[in-house]
Each structure stands twice: as structure tokens, then as C-alpha cells.
Amino acid sequence: MRHRGPEEEACGVWLDAAALKRRKMQTHLIKLGTKMLPLLPGERKPNDPFTQRRGTRQTSIASFVTLQSGMASGGNQKNIFSLKENQTNKECKRTQLDCLDDGLLSPLVTSAPADIQEAGHPRSPQISGCQGLEMSSLTMMSLTQPDVLMGTGESKGPLDSSFSQYLERSCLLDQREAKRKGEGLRESKTDCPGMGSHIRPPGSKCHQPLDKAEMGKRGPTKENRQAPVHLQTYRSGSCSRKKTLLVTESPCPLSLFPWDSERSDRDSWSQLFTEDSQGQQVIAHNTKMPFRDVTNARNQGSGQFPDSPQAQGQDGPAQLHLQSYLLFTQDSEGNRVIRH
């Protein structure tokens, strides 16, 4: 076996672990005025508290940021979060008291989120903002400092008290809302002057029950929703009588079935247009008159034009008949078409 003594001593450097442990370690923070690089001739002194620590490897952004004095330990960080939480709770309590004084606080605002979604009432912007701040602060604390929530019992105290207060407030407000709903149902049965008793849903206007004759009149209009019937009802006050019922009917008769209206549309379309000898679609006219050449018809009688004052003195039907001959003509099949 070969001896490795001389080979090991060739390095000449021996490291003592005890001496390394006794080396002076950094126990204080760098002052805020420390400069990382020399200033240029025209550069100002930096005011930012971003300083680099000696002997530490920069592995995160937090290592560049110097904490404030007295906030370096974990207990002080917990105190920061507890102070923020207390401030948030105080702000929310002030907002709720202001809303209660103004009479603007909704009973379902501070209830549980599931109750709010079931009831369908929107949250008040102020209270929802406070609750959002509380939830965001709790989420931030749980993400950044898990030992604040899961560690010592000192940090759990403010959270438990605030959560219990939140539950108590929600339960009390839910009970008040239930009582108000019960009172609203009792008061909903009202008797309007000159009318029979009817049930009024809470939060809405009461409507007078219609007579049977009026219901019979309105029955066909409900069945045929496509019919052009316009109902105009005038009401005065929260509980008033129906004054007028104006029904404007279209000139064409109303049809009870939609296919009747489609059939009438097809018939009217076929009556409006027809085809000439060349297969082109032209406007159809029911009256078929014998073909006459009316090029010299305007010079009939006294030789005046039909638009002249003398021609206007003639009888109306004859003049209209003359103008129709000037506008229309007949094709080879005898159909009346527009003159081109």
C-alpha cells in the first residue's frame, strides 16, 4: 500500500471548521444611504431603499428590498398583518354604521355569499368592498405567511374574533330580513277603494282584477299575439281603476290562426304581380280593358291638355280615366301593365 501523506500535504492549505464558525457574521442591516456603485458626475444621490447586502446571494426580489427599522423579525411581520386586519375591520364597521344611520343598508348585504346568490339581491358597493378587502387580506396572509394562520395562537386571535363577529352580524341580519318578509306578506292583502280585496305581491304595484266581459274581449287578442292590436291602459296611483281601453284595429280582418295570415299574404302577392308573354314579372291589374291607342286622347274636345285649367274644369272621373290611359297600357295577352 502506498502512503498518501506527502501528497495530501502538497496543497499546504488546511481549513478549520471551528475557525470558520467563529468568523464574524453580519447581524445588522445596511444603512439606507449605502451606494452600490460610484455616482457619475451628473448623477444624484439615490433615495430608493434598495440596497445590496454583502455576502448574500440575490435569489429573490425581497432580498434587494431593505425592511424598515424594527420590522425585520417574523413577529414584527405578524404584527404588520394584524394591524392591517384591525384597520380593515374598523373601516368596515364605520361604513356599516354610516349605512345604518342613513337607512341605506340592505339586510342581505352582510349575509353569507351563498344566501346572497340564492336571494339574487346585488351587494352594496361599500360593504362588498370591505368584504373584498377582508378576503384579500386573509388570502394574502395565507399565501405569504402560512405560519400566521397555522402557527402560534397569538396570531389566530384577531382572525377568530373577526370571523365570529362576521357570523353573528350575518345571523342577526338574516333574522331581521325574515321578520320583514313576514310583515310584508301580512300587509300585502290590501283593500283598494271601490274594489274587491286582492293580493298584492311585496315590492310591486297592485293590479285591479278585470271583469269577465273585459277578459272575454282580451281573450282572442292573447291567443293571436301576431294580430296588430294595440292595448293602451292608463293607471293613476299605485292602486287605481282601469280608465280606458283603446283598441286600434287594422283595416284587414284579424285572423285567429297564423296560417290564415300566411295564406292571405300569398293570395295578395299573387294578385299584385303576374307574368307577361316573355315570362317577366310585372304588376297585375284586375281590370282588363280593350286595347286602345290614346296617343291623341289629350287633344280631344277643345284641344286642351288635361292638366290645363280648362281641362280641370271637366268632370273628375273622365279626367282620371284619361290619365290612367296615359300611364298604363296592355301587353299581347291583354294584361294591363305600366307604360314604358
From Swiss-Prot:
One of its GO terms (biological process) is negative regulation of double-strand break repair via nonhomologous end joining. Residues 178-209, 293-317 are annotated as: Disordered. InterPro entries: AUNIP. Residues 175-340 are annotated as: Interaction with AURKA. GO terms for cellular component: centrosome; cytoplasm; nucleus; site of DNA damage; spindle pole. Signal peptide: none annotated. One of its GO terms (molecular function) is damaged DNA binding. It is found in: Nucleus; Chromosome; Cytoplasm, Cytoskeleton, Microtubule organizing center, Centrosome; Cytoplasm, Cytoskeleton, Spindle pole. Keywords: Chromosome, Cytoplasm, Cytoskeleton, DNA damage, DNA repair, DNA-binding, Nucleus, Phosphoprotein. Residues 266-340 are annotated as: Interaction with RBBP8/CtIP. The modification Phosphoserine is found at S277. Residues 296-313 have a biased composition (Polar residues). It holds the Pfam family AIB. Residues 178-190 have a biased composition (Basic and acidic residues). Belongs to the AUNIP family. Interacts (via C-terminus) with AURKA (via C-terminus). Interacts (via N-terminus) with NIN; this interaction blocks NIN phosphorylation by both AURKA and GSK3B. Identified in a complex with NIN and AURKA. Interacts with RBBP8/CtIP. DNA-binding protein that accumulates at DNA double-strand breaks (DSBs) following DNA damage and promotes DNA resection and homologous recombination. Serves as a sensor of DNA damage: binds DNA with a strong preference for DNA substrates that mimic structures generated at stalled replication forks, and anchors RBBP8/CtIP to DSB sites to promote DNA end resection and ensuing homologous recombination repair. Inhibits non-homologous end joining (NHEJ). Required for the dynamic movement of AURKA at the centrosomes and spindle apparatus during the cell cycle. This is Aurora kinase A- and ninein-interacting protein. The gene is Aunip.
